[in-house]
Amino acid sequence: MANAFWCIVEDDRQGTPKKVMAEVIGEAARLSSGQAEAVWFTDKATEAGLKQLAEWGANKVWLRENAAFAPYRSEIWTGAAAELAAKATPKAILAPVTSRQREFVARLAARLGVGLAADCVAFAMDGDKLVATRPVYAGKLLAKVTWAKAPWVATLRPNVFRPADAQPGRVATVERPSVATPVAQMRFVERREEVSTGLPELTEAEIVLSGGRGMKGPEHYVILEDMARVIGAAVGASRAAVDAGWRPHRFQIEIGRASCRERV
């Protein structure tokens, strides 16, 4: 649909969309007068996941389910998304700020020959143009930007936009497009599964406990993790702690890493 706002689904790799998608779909529906559509690249979609996207406000789910989409490789996602966008001609393509969406959406915008507004914190329609507000200069200023042509491509900072209210029983059309799955030019030499801490992710947490050099070593982060489990917080780390190898890069909360909008 030419006026549709696409929402690129970020999931937990187990067939469940992350809760940040309620924000993305809710904002897309608001801006497009209810013409929000979800685009899901996955190797294992679930009926519960499709139901959740519909209840958050997606009118249609473009489902590309193929083993080639996991583990994530940007070249495969980009090729499939670009071909689908050329056929369906969406007005806008929105995605949450996550590690893989940062890379994928940037490559997709370049492939489509359009601009990208990253880390957006607000949107408004100005006639038939979309205006995005995004931080610049390490968050010291806010800039309003727009696009020379559609599709308008943007990433949304999590925990900023109002999540869509779930509408139990709402249904969406599920479209399984027949687009080619690109052949990967890269191969995995080794794959290591991350061990779950059982704590909220930085991008979705309302409370973050962060430790830096003062932790004196990686073994002391268990103190923060124990406290985080009690209060329902996520655990982050400073750049110095990450550079020292005390915590993985996904825990870094300073410029260039995880984008979080915690309350505490």
Residue ranges and their predicted role:
Residues 1-263:
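N-terminal glycine-rich FAD/FM-binding segment characteristic of electron-transfer flavoproteins
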